[in-house]
Amino acid sequence: MLGAVVVRVTDLNLVSVATPGRVQVWATRLGSGAPVPNVQLSALAVKYDWQDGSRVVSRRTLAPVRTDAQGLATFSLRDGEQLSVRGQVTLGGQPHSAQLGRTENELWTGVAERARALIQTDKPVYRPGETLRGFAVLRRLGAGTRLPYTGPVTVRLRAGYPDATLAQLTVKPDADGLVRFSLPLPQDVKIGGYSLEVELPAAPSASNPNPEPDVSQVPVEVRAFVKPLFTLDLSGPQEVVSGTPLTLSARGELYQGGPANVQAEAFMVDGYASDELYPDYDAGDNGLRYQDLNSDEVYGENAAPGIDPKRRPDQTLTLRGGRATLPLKLQAKNGQPTRYAVALRARDEYGRDVWARRPVTVYPAAIKFVQPRVEGAERRRVSVAVQQVGSGKALAGRRVQAEVVRVFYVTQPDGKSVRREQRISQSVLTSDAAGRVTLNVTLTPGQEGGYVARLSTQDSAGRTARASLDIGSVYKSGAERQAPTLVLSPERSRYQPGDTARLTLNTDLPVGTPLLLSVNAEDRGQVKLIQVTGPTMTLTWPVTAALGPAFSVSAVAVRGGQTAQAFSGELLVPRFDQRLDVQVTAGSEVKPGAEVTFTVRTSRGGQPASALVTLAAVHESVYAVVGDPTPNPWRFLWGATTPQFEIRSSSSQADDGRGGGGGSEAVFYRSDLREVAAFQAVRTDAQGTAKVTVRMPEGLGSYRLSARAFTRTGAAGEARGEQRVGLPFAVRLIRPRVLTAGDTGSVAVSAADRTGQGGNVTLTLGANGQTQTANSPLQGGSATRLFSIKAPQDAQALTLTASAQRGANGERDGLRETVPVRPAGARQLLSGSGSVGADKAGGNASVSLKWPQEAQPESLTLDLAATPLQLALTGLDAALADPADRWVTTDALSARLSSNLDLAALAGPFGWPEVRTRALAQARRDLASLLALRGSDGWGWTEGSPASAEMTARALDALVQAKGAGLTDAVTLQVVRQQAELLLKKSPNSPVLAAGWRGLGPPLRPCDWPAPG
């Protein structure tokens, strides 16, 4: 039997340069690369549903076009459309064809970004029931311009899972492009992460009748949180020689002012050893790049290190007067630089963690190799700095042993690959006056493998310092015919408008070969056809503002059936002319409730500039819970972005070449404890100055001032300041975040003295109309006493007053706070039945209702009913509703989840589909909230509380019941099982946890896990 293969022979090649909304096609000969005019191009534009990628929303056949004398033609696209192109032409009397986008979705680079909104909220984290206030500064993006957006926009607060919109409103900006908005959060809003979005519609046109809107967003956290009471910092050397004693300094400071005297635990984290050096390709450009989220603030120092909860601390220390020292003696591992992180943890009176971290690198010798640079293509120039450990002093005249090796792999007869090394060179280098050594290395074609430089030297004590550095690689050609070479090297990586960009093009293509240059910035691009004039060419391009904030140059050629491409990488055009200099100043420390005036100054290029300024003053402790996510305004508007373009070819691609409280008789109780002292927008005058007067809250501590400025012509900038509110002698109240009705608990009252006078203080707590008093001496500037309190049964809040007084007639301070009181737990269904008959003495019947032995009921409510139907309807609305209080706890969620699952189970047999639907819907919400409360080692009472056996057991019981109802799966239970096992090892005598762990059932076998994807 004979088989036949149809081979289509063509000498037509299509190259596409796609940018948002446009695809340019270049038709060439496949062999010679010569442009082909008059090629008829037909195109199909398809738009797919962005959620369901297989569903077609629209399909358009575009009008055919023909290539011009340079072989170029252009197609326009609507937002979201993807293109496929087919070209046909007659050459030498024979038909030739080529196609791009065979799968109908290849030629697409996204949708053009037409506008942005810089969103700022009055604080980054909210409690349920609070009101979110915000600003958004809207700008329309143009070629080198950022002008105010003038149309109405939609502001919405969205939950990620399940996808839902919690609040939404439409607002219109003012002449500065500023919108103001307020979004009250429901009392029953679930804790977790949300997204605050601003949607900016685009104007429709005949060519793009349904443009997609731009959406800017910023994360918002909702938590039932209590702010930390103190800061914790570690300072000291970040470099040390192995075995040398190292002392770090720990410092704790109360947010309200004064030292924090606390116990702390130290952990040595990581200990990663490596002598590898990595070139810094950033070259200091990070501050010039686009920023849509201040990730360093949000995810930096606020993130707790991942330490095994079972791990014991390496050291413990006590901060007295807010200070302590941490002596260490760290060793380098394997004779290599070893990077450690020293983590310090302290806890407040309620067990909430406060962390500090300090990176420390331990070197095997007193010399280090740093700041590697690798330059060039085939001929590489490698330079490394030789410095003294600790001081960073450059070491000139240092002799360094250098070896270059080629690392490659050889395939054995049995098919296994064996690693081999070949020494390429060996030399002795001497560091120059700047402390750098330089090594020249040639990457030899045909000698494939990775090239590595190994450096070593010795310090005065005879200890050896080593480093290794990847220089580059030579790849084995996978093609039988030699691929054309095309290398594009820019003269530099930064330009300013008015400059001329110069690039060197190296190629082995014949003289006269056509080259298509493409210059792209943001969503814009332009092409130019040139010819090869020799193996080395200098290309120039004028740099205009339209090429900002970053552009790239690419070259493409077709030859011998292959397509060669070269890219310059991103070339930055930072718009420093659009950077505003902003200053915000405050006064010296003021008393609580005092009026202060903040002064904001804006200038541009050294000259005063009138600008819109958003000003916020927020208590610094809030940012210890969640960092400020608002990006730098200049980087948000003018930061460099990667140009949106893509080049494709219908032929194969060639391989690439890389004050103080007084002594008055009555105590003044501070009660204005707002976290946000100011949140407003102002405009600086023609002299670039604005003054804002506010009344400060009565909460003590530092308030962060954030000033972000914008001009209508696109300039932007920001600055920070600080306003402190303080007293030389002050009282602190350390209380629980929430109380349960009828509970008995404790609170701490503390005096903080910043005068250094010492002496005895009288601490007083008032609650429920009763007053408790204790005397205590000041030690290290503080004195603390615990007092008992009892939560009322029928109130939604408990007001506490705390005061401190030095001696009989000395300074005094008072504080008034309100603690929410929640109901005494959600209902748990216990049911039973019996019969009352005439033959029963007195017509009585006994029914036993039992709860688990380890349970501790807070209250019992008995419902009697003549029929099961009447019983099921008792208290139905209360069971289906979220609690009226705003505090979310593990025990309440677990109990309510269990109750709603019981109710759903009853509703089925009784034929109440509506009741069952409502109960299951609430159960799903409770389940999501319960899973969100899970910490790294189990469940605590609330979010952020240490995991406890009791709370974890309650959560496990509820999860097992949820699995039985089909609301969760075995994989989720497997994850919590592992946490429960770890917690059970720490609390082996906890019967409630043991029972909850057993209720999870057997663990999953490997074959039970779902397949990836």
Swiss-Prot record:
Residues 804-844 are annotated as: Disordered. InterPro entries: A2M_N_BRD, Macroglobln_a2, MG2, YfhM-like. GO terms for molecular function: endopeptidase inhibitor activity. It comes from the Bacteria. Disulfide bonds: none annotated. Transmembrane segments: none annotated. PANTHER family: ALPHA-2-MACROGLOBULIN HOMOLOG, UBIQUITIN DOMAIN-CONTAINING PROTEIN. Belongs to the protease inhibitor I39 (alpha-2-macroglobulin) family. Bacterial alpha-2-macroglobulin subfamily. This is Alpha-2-macroglobulin homolog. It comes from Deinococcus radiodurans (strain ATCC 13939 / DSM 20539 / JCM 16871 / CCUG 27074 / LMG 4051 / NBRC 15346 / NCIMB 9279 / VKM B-1422 / R1). The lineage of its organism: Bacteria, Thermotogati, Deinococcota, Deinococci, Deinococcales.
